[in-house]
Curated annotation (Swiss-Prot):
GO cellular component annotations of the record: cytosol
Cofactor(s) demanded: Zn(2+)
EC number from the UniProt entry: 6.1.1.16
Name used for this protein in its record: Cysteine--tRNA ligase
Provenance organism: Mycoplasmopsis pulmonis (strain UAB CTIP)
């Protein structure tokens, strides 16, 4: 099917078959709402279902049906304000013909209930049909493997289980008036759905993290990446220790730098910001940043920012000037208390909204302009975290003042609470004895730097201290990576299993506590203990921690393991035969990959 964007006009049918080719169920009139490179997503309401027996009925509540392309499952999501209900079918990859999605149902299913209970169902039917339909070993193996993958998605809350995946679709349905129903049972559906969502978010004991994000006008360098890699480690550590987390990382997609770039290049602000936002997402993928839950953009939230500034105005914190509106810092008790003497000299009211004649403009009470930088972040925190205090607010150390001080002032003004329990001001990355900066021209682009080397450098540094990038530092990181590779390959070679005992949890807790020094000390103790004793339990602890750190080399080692295991066994075989010449040939292959 031709790729299209959200809210397509056509309706299609769906047919489910048994393995012997019998059609046993059909859905008529499912609306395509999304068709991209990954999924076809259908919206079902009043669709007609027909059974092989002749029985038929109409869908009476809204649901989504997700068909991942080239996967062995599809997902039916019943949308309910009290919580969504997932029904996952294990199937063949679907085909599309005659305006119909067609697939073979392998009977075994997974249910996920609104309170997050998960259940594998119809196992007996699957086992019966192995005999009745003669499922070959390849089908049985595929089904069991897919069940494990889906359970992993659920455990990590990734893919369609991610908190934003369904809610973003529901939000688009609501905006397009597709969740307005005549039925009394479904009255005010979208309002109830999102009220319940906000209530659940507020009531849950969630570890709440916000990290100031980039202005997307150029490619990011490794200095920009330090904060996000550090915070990703901390958030994943909290997840590992059993905490639910909400990690928000904003995107500034309109500001003076973007407008200047637009004027210089004669390309619209939107095209520039979209281009570099795409580039940033590629870099996040390269650096294996997967813990971010929301990435709100300024241009998508102008109306909310306007309402936020109005709320401050009603409380008497806004002063109107000829060129915009400023926040009255004199009304905030202890404003600037944490500042240095030099910073205190620079304390002044700051713009919430500033008039401008250059670039894209928005309207605030008759003033054409743009929101202030400090208001954007404060609004996102207030809106997404339901006016609660964060557990960690992170950013570069250069944002301490005025940005973070001004965010906190606005939050106190609106909500009478501090914006965060803990500030995390990550140290700068220095190159050629200066702060890495585009204006100085001393940058190393993140896309050009090895992500594993960078992570090693960060883990072996204090979170708040500056890092000086040198050839010696990079070479030292390579030595550590090679050591980790050899240990991890040995772990796989011995067919050991990951360990989640107190020793591993202790080290992960040190990452969660931002105590990277103690983490390294303990990890190196276990590496030394293994090298001395060669005890499998020590290697298991070390490898479990290395796996937690989520290096790129892990994926490559696991991908090539079967091939390299054969090479390893051949090498060992020649050693036993004392055929050292041939043994050295195979040993060299493993050495070249850094595996032994």
């Amino acid at each position: 099917m031709k790729s299209k964007t959200f809210l397509e006009k056509n309706f299609i049918n769906v047919q489910a078959y048994k393995y012997n080719g019998d059609l046993y169920r059909q859905w008529n009139g499912s609306k395509i709402i999304k068709n991209d490179s990954q999924n076809i997503i259908l919206y079902n309401f009043h669709s007609r279902i027909m059974e092989k027996s002749g029985k038929s009925w109409q869908v009476s509540e809204p649901s989504l049906w997700i068909f991942p392309k080239n996967e062995n499952y599809n997902v039916n999501v019943l949308l309910r304000p009290e919580g969504n209900y997932y029904y996952i079918n294990l199937t063949s990859p679907f085909i599309f013909e005659d305006n119909t999605i067609k697939y073979i149902d392998f009977d075994i299913d997974i249910k996920v209930y609104p309170k997050k209970e998960i259940e594998i169902v119809d196992i007996k039917e699957f086992q019966k049909n192995i005999k009745d339909y003669g499922y070959p070993p390849s089908v049985r193996k595929m089904v069991y493997k897919q069940v494990q993958n889906l359970l992993m998605f659920y455990e990590k809350q990734t893919s369609f289980f991610h908190r934003d995946f369904i809610d973003n679709i529901v939000n688009s349905l609501a905006k397009n008036k597709m969740l307005v129903f005549q039925s009394k049972k479904l009255s005010n559906f979208s309002q109830r759905y999102f009220e319940e969502l906000r209530k659940n978010t507020k009531n849950e004991k969630i570890f709440k993290v916000y990290l100031c994000g980039p202005t997307v006008y150029d490619e990011v360098h490794i200095g920009n990446m330090r904060s996000v890699v550090v915070v990703d480690l901390i958030v994943r550590a909290q997840k590992y220790l059993g905490k639910k987390t909400l990690f928000v990382h904003n995107i500034t997609d309109i500001d003076d730098k973007i407008i200047e770039r637009s004027i210089q290049s004669k390309i619209s602000e939107n095209k520039i910001s979209e281009k570099y936002f795409r580039e940033y997402k590629k870099v996040l993928k390269k650096y294996r940043i997967k813990s971010i839950d929301k990435m709100p953009k300024v241009t998508d939230n102008i109306d909310s920012i306007v309402k936020f500034i109005n709320s401050l105005d009603k409380k008497g914190y806004v002063i109107q000037k000829d060129d915009g509106f400023v926040f009255d810092v004199s009304k905030i008790k202890n404003y600037g208390k944490r500042l240095s003497r030099e910073d205190k000299k620079q304390v002044e009211n700051f713009y919430l909204w500033k008039s401008t004649t250059k670039g894209v403009q928005y309207n605030y009470n008759g003033f054409l302009g743009r929101p202030g930088w400090h208001s954007e972040c404060t609004l996102f925190i207030d809106d997404i975290f339901n006016s609660q205090t964060l557990d960690i607010h992170a950013g570069g150390i250069d944002l301490t003042f005025p940005h973070h001080e001004n965010e906190n002032a606005q939050y106190i003004a609106k909500n009478d609470v501090k914006i965060t329990k803990h500030w995390l001001h990550v140290g700068q990355v220095m190159f050629k004895n200066q702060k890495m900066s585009k204006s100085l021209g001393n940058v190393i682009l993140a896309k050009d730097f090895d992500e594993d080397i960078f992570k090693i450098i960060l883990i072996n540094s204090s979170v708040t201290a500056p890092i000086y990038i040198t050839n010696e530092l990079i070479e030292n990181a390579k030595v550590i990576i090679n050591k980790y590779k050899k240990l991890y390959f040995k772990f796989l070679n011995l067919s050991l299993s990951f360990n989640f005992d107190d020793n591993v949890r202790y080290m992960v807790r040190k990452i969660a506590d931002k105590d990277f020094s103690s983490f390294n000390l303990k990890l190196n103790e276990y590496i030394k203990a293994y090298n001395t004793s060669l005890e499998a339990d020590k290697l298991t602890i070390v490898s479990s921690v290395i796996h937690f750190l989520n290096f790129s080399f892990i994926e490559q080692i696991e991908k090539d393991f079967r091939k390299n295991k054969k090479i390893y066994d051949i090498w060992q075989g020649f050693l036993k035969q004392k055929n050292y010449e041939k043994a050295d040939m195979f040993r060299k292959i493993l050495i070249d990959q850094g595996l032994i």
